[in-house]
Regions:
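Bacterial N-terminal signal peptides that target proteins for export
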Residues: 1-10
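C-terminal motif of bacterial Sec signal peptides marking the signal peptidase cleavage site
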Residues: 17-20
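Bacterial signal peptide processing site
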Residues: 22-24
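Periplasmic/extracellular, small/polar-rich flexible segments of pilin-like filament-forming proteins
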Residues: 27-29
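Feature marking well-ordered beta-strand scaffolds used for ligand recognition
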Residues: 31-486
Length: 486
């Protein structure tokens, strides 16, 4: 495709995303810069061991000097090594997306699933598209075994989700605003390398993000721009049935192990009994037990909500327990300038929230880098990709290897790559590792990295799988004993 046309497509994509995020951010006015007393401090940086190629400046920064000197072509690593990768070469469109899921079937086949579309299906320019299925039996040599090309899989946006308990993969058709709500459901339990399509149905109302009850029987279709959080019964995978639509805007959401709680990032809408302003951004806890129990005409109740001074765009919240105590790991995407050109450039990044009293959730610590700090804004603004509203410095997704006593959390932090934090002491997390792959020349936008995906894990081998929008799928091993077992 001619370069001027490609640039036009890319710029239109940015314009649409900015408009969509503005409508779904739930912030009616731009915020001033957070005061010094409100700005959380960066997480202590990692100590890099043998074999590392550490960053050259402040934590998380990839400078223009790094690019012009050729340093970015070597990549940046700290207590990590790449053991395998998969990507189409010389691509114009994206080759990685928002989610990486892992599933091991009864026969022992180990599989990875990841979307390749990101904002819009620009990968169709390269005759690629959909959700890639990789056989990861040998993680040093991932093998593409299938491409899922049904409507939702062609453009799932942030909705690709998997139930490990049931062996079900699902997504809702979406884009940066919202898609028409077509839900695709696949059975992966028999042979994970070759998913079996069970249904394609317009049951999701509007799509952008999703959630899945761990038992794989309730799929939630969500949109941050419209109060249309929809629960769908997947008891019969071939016949999805809408249960109800909840009047709440939801970006990312996670469901508790028993299916009775939904943890919503975003949260604008008009929930009966809401404990906060209708358009307040943050994290909301919902009681969805009547949906899980399949009660006739179920009622959903808001339990609580919480926000924080450094908020940008709440992305996802994951329930965990550490030593028997419940917490959430939440991450904001991008900066507040993404949704408002007059924004102060506040970077939300990540945090840990204590929900021991679920009626009074409380932020207890933060997951952020030195480059995220307001005092470093002038320094970072000239870095490659830093001023693109859909790239830049900031967070996008976090995930944990287990929800019970996880020792680490791994987060995609866009230009800063994959970052790994030790959370055994949730009040005092610390960075232990990072991986930012070598960059490659690009026509537009300029050469940089675009780590956006929720990662998956192989704890027994200390591996983390994730994707970069520009360079594809990576299997990364944490080295030097940085990832503690307990």
């Amino acid at each position: 495709m001619p370069l001027p046309i490609l640039r036009t497509i890319s710029l239109l994509t940015l314009a649409v995303l900015i408009s969509a995020c503005s409508s779904g951010s739930n912030n009616s006015t731009s915020k001033p810069p957070a005061s010094a007393s409100e700005v959380p401090q960066p997480t202590p940086r990692a100590t890099c061991g043998p074999g590392s190629r550490p960053e050259t400046g402040i934590q998380g920064r990839v400078s223009r000097e790094d690019l012009t000197s050729g340093r970015t072509r070597e990549g940046f690593t700290c207590n990590t090594e790449m053991i395998g990768s998969y990507s189409k070469q010389n691509n114009f469109g994206t080759v990685g997306g928002f989610k990486v899921e892992r599933y091991t079937d009864a026969a022992g086949h180990d599989c990875a699933y990841y979307d390749t579309t990101l904002l819009f299906p620009t990968n169709l320019i390269d005759a690629q598209g959909g959700v890639n299925v990789l056989d990861m039996s040998d993680p040093t040599q991932p093998v593409l075994t299938a491409q899922l090309l049904t409507p939702a899989m062609l453009s799932p946006h942030e909705s690709l989700v998997l139930s490990k308990e049931r062996g079900v993969l699902a997504a809702v058709l979406g884009n940066p605003a919202f898609g028409p709500g077509v839900v695709d459901v696949y059975d992966i339990s028999g042979d994970c390398r070759h998913p079996v399509l069970k249904s394609v149905a317009p049951v999701g109302v509007l799509g952008h993000e999703s959630g899945f009850s761990p038992d794989g029987k309730t799929f939630y279709s969500a949109s941050p721009g419209t109060p249309t959080l929809t629960a769908i019964d997947l008891t019969n995978l071939s016949v999805p049935v809408p249960i109800m639509t909840i009047p709440l805007k939801s970006h990312g959401l996670s469901i508790s192990a028993d299916g009775n709680r939904a943890y919503i990032a975003g949260g604008g809408g008009n929930m009966p009994g809401s404990s906060g302003p209708e358009n307040a951004s943050g994290m909301v806890i919902l009681d969805v037990s009547e949906i899980q129990a399949r009660k006739p005409k179920p009622t959903v109740r808001e339990i609580s909500r919480v926000t924080w001074p450094s908020i940008s765009i709440p992305q996802n919240a994951i329930p965990i327990t550490i030593k028997g105590k419940p917490y959430l790991v939440e991450i904001d995407e991008y900066t507040d300038s993404t949704t408002s050109p007059s924004g102060a450039g506040n970077i939300g990044a990540g945090r840990i929230i204590d929900i021991s009293d679920e009626t009074k959730p409380k932020v207890i610590s933060n997951l952020r880098l030195e480059v995220h700090q307001p005092e470093n804004k002038a320094v970072r603004d000239g870095d490659p990709g830093a001023n693109l509203p859909v790239q830049g410095y900031g967070g996008h997704y976090c995930n944990v290897p287990t929800r019970v006593d996880p020792t680490i959390v791994a987060c995609s932090m866009i230009i800063s790559g994959l970052r790994v934090f030790d959370i055994r002491d949730p009040f005092h997390p610390r960075e232990i590792a990072y991986f930012n792959p070598p960059t490659s020349p690009r026509n537009f936008p300029e050469e940089s990295n675009w780590a956006m995906s929720s990662p998956s894990f192989v704890p027994e081998r200390k591996e983390i799988w994730y994707t970069d929008g520009f360079s594809g799928f990576y299997a990364v091993r944490v080295t030097n004993g940085a990832w503690a077992d307990k």
